[in-house]
């Protein structure tokens, strides 16, 4: 994210520089195309010829050229310095500059770790040449400049002298610039080296994690339920992703149906389809709960902002009704009463289940702490095992709570569907979907926020 | 609405014919005991004192302003028999082990409504409150 923000503004700058370079010389325009990036040599080799062939008039033009060239070099330096702060960025940046990949560059380089690293390796070459050329160019430019001066004002000794001094000063400046450039290069190479080591570490970690994973899997392969739990969680996530895509498609249909003033009967078909699709996710969650209740309770299959609002493995029905608010008006008095009652009863049911969960935690705590703890904890193994079995039994209730919570959600949606007209229900589904989309977008933004 | 009629129907079925035919499975005194216990109050909950879902349903009724009569089966002398009979009434032939949601069981106006999910579903679809009003458990 950051790199794309950074690189975009540089590109026009780069272009403007090269167009400066050839300003006022239309005959050089054709060279504009083949000259890539900072490979100035070709241009420089040609420039003196052009200048000598032309009159003094070009002197000033060339001065600008030089300054701009210098400025451009400075620009490059700034970019390099900016880039050195994050070596991934540099890689992408230099890649862009070196090969003039403007649009797709970032995306391509970003596509995977390996890609970007190989790009970085390639680009280190680019950087080397471009910085070197940068300093060489200046010398060449100076040479050309000087020769040109001599050609135009060869009789004036003082002029030559002052030009010598200027040349010396510029040479000194060049040396200084070259030294700085070498230091930067060193730092950059060091940075690359660091990232290479970091990558190697990450790869090592990944390998170890994979090995552990396979060990765990092999270790419990005798215990089928465990393996099934792992597979079950995985397959739930798969199913959920599939469900989300299907839901999105249905919502799109519904939206276009509402916008195009579709007839009530046709709209009802779409609304009923969304409703029964909701039933499908509750069915899937039911299976997931049986497989791994803690996974469903954790909500790891949802985005962070969705998780923030999560209650017993899903949304709060009463909250959903609050979201709908005045988005589905106008409601008749009867509908209004129905919605109010629904909100109240879902709130009461939620409170009851929450209190049941609290009781569950409390009794689990008591069960686990009532077994003898402390110094003579190993004294009574049977006592310990008995309490553990009891605690296991209590944890089994968790599944029931999750199932009840999902039933509550499902019933609330169904009741909402019954209270509202088809058109209102369609709008309600769209509002709910938009709200969840916003939560997901918020999560993405939050995860991508710059962190210092 | 559909839940209410369904449960009432199944209960009456159990009471009238099935029970008569299976005297050995349903000792008549246990059923009679359940019936009399269920008639004690407008709302009666058969519960287990350590059950957290039972705790939740008690809180649900109290949250609605109803004060139910609660029978903690683990503290009653014939609790186990009553529990078994209730599971039969609910249609859980496999027993309590495979369906932990069986208890609590709720009776309103002497008639069985069902376990937690039935009670919650009828609350959400708006049929529970009229039922409670009819039974005299709720005034407003």
Swiss-Prot record, chain A:
Domain DOG1: 233-449
GO biological process, alphabetically ordered: DNA-templated transcription; regulation of flower development
Single GO cellular component term: nucleus
Coiled coil: none
Null mutant phenotype: Mutant plants have extra floral organs. The modal numbers of organs in mutant flowers are 5 sepals, 5 petals, 5 stamens, and 2 carpels in contrast with the tetramerous pattern of the wild type.
GO molecular function, one term: transcription cis-regulatory region binding
Sequence segments annotated as region (Leucine-zipper): 192-206
Region ranges (Basic motif): 166-186
Pfam families according to UniProt: bZIP_1, DOG1
SMART domains associated with the record: BRLZ (SM00338)
Main location: nucleus
Keywords: Activator, Coiled coil, DNA-binding, Nucleus, Transcription, Transcription regulation
Purpose: Transcriptional activator involved in the determination of floral organ number. Acts to determine floral organ patterning by establishing floral organ primordia in specific numbers and positions. Plays a role in regulating stem cell fate by directly controlling AG expression. Binds to the 5'-AAGAAT-3' cis-acting element found in AG promoter. Might represent a target for a post-translational modification by GRXC7/ROXY1.
Description of how the protein assembles with itself and partners: Interacts with GRXC7/ROXY1. Interacts with BOP1 and BOP2.
Entry protein name: Transcription factor PERIANTHIA
Organism field: Arabidopsis thaliana (Mouse-ear cress)
From Swiss-Prot, chain B:
One Pfam entry name: Glutaredoxin
Observed effect of gene inactivation: No visible phenotype. Defection in sporogenous cell formation in adaxial anther lobes when associated with the disruption of GRXC7/ROXY1 leading to fertility defects.
GO terms (BP aspect): negative regulation of DNA-templated transcription; negative regulation of transcription by RNA polymerase II
Location of the protein in the cell: Cytoplasm; Nucleus
Residue ranges of the motif Responsive for interaction with TGA factors: 137-140
Top-level lineage group: Eukaryota
InterPro entries: GlrX-like_pln_2, Glutaredoxin, Thioredoxin-like_sf
Role description: Has a glutathione-disulfide oxidoreductase activity in the presence of NADPH and glutathione reductase. Reduces low molecular weight disulfides and proteins. Involved in flower development.
Known partners and oligomeric status: Interacts with TGA9 and TGA10 in the nucleus.
Protein name: Glutaredoxin-C8
Gene: GRXC8
